[in-house]
Amino acid sequence: MNICLIDETGAGDGALSVLAARWGLTHDADNPMALVMTSARLELRKRDEPKLGGIFVDFVEGAMAHRRKFGGGRGEAVAKAVGIKGSYLPQVVDATAGLGRDAFVLASVGCHVRMLERNPVVAALLDDGLARGYQDAEIGPWLRERLQLIHASSLTALEAITPRPDVVYLDPMFPHKQKSALVKKEMRVFQSLVGPDLDADGLLAPARRLAIKRVVVKRPDYAPPLGDVATPNAVVTKGHRFDIYTGTPA
């Protein structure tokens, strides 16, 4: 994949070249999208819109930490949707990981989550965030145990994952209407990088074959059901719904 690669660390140790080789990235000086290695983290920037700032994954501080400490925990809609109840903490495959927010919420309340991400740049951002999270004294021990990244396309990986999870979680990219600054910023950068999930409808059937108990699909409230497959079961929040489909018992 072509992207502009920028090293702002000043270290001169070739770490960016190693990272590019690992994720199959080729430097393109004219590309408006840039993957930037700073001394603190890896960032994705849209060079023709510098005011948007950098997109990065941070499980330790900022919004993720606030959500972990002060969010709803088990009461969050995503936790209810995957079926967390009492001592039951399902094994989850998040087949459209993105920046890992929902996967992190599930891991923070005790679920073991395997994240799938096919875009190499997004996977690199996730991997960088995980590496820093794993080193953190407070969350590192349980994060290492509960949250893992698999760089693969869900369309193929969902046929081959073992052991089978209790739940497959899907949150395909869908054009957002919301006007919040964060969503606008992230979606503009993300959609410039990866575009819409045009093949997302093809995920539901393999997800239902893989999941032992259920498949959960997060949708904006104005979006049709994935693949136009309606379900009467959903957890509904302001702005979103989590459609729930049966899996395939072991």
UniProtKB/Swiss-Prot annotation:
Q: Transmembrane ranges?
A: none
Role this protein plays: Specifically methylates the guanosine in position 1516 of 16S rRNA.
So what does this thing catalyse?
guanosine(1516) in 16S rRNA + S-adenosyl-L-methionine = N(2)-methylguanosine(1516) in 16S rRNA + S-adenosyl-L-homocysteine + H(+)
Q: Which GO terms describe its cellular component?
A: cytoplasm
Extract one GO molecular function annotation from the record: rRNA (guanine-N2-)-methyltransferase activity
Task: Quote the protein name from its UniProt record.
Answer: Ribosomal RNA small subunit methyltransferase J
Q: Which gene encodes it?
A: rsmJ
Localisation per UniProt entry:
Cytoplasm
Q: What species is this protein from?
A: Cronobacter sakazakii (strain ATCC BAA-894)
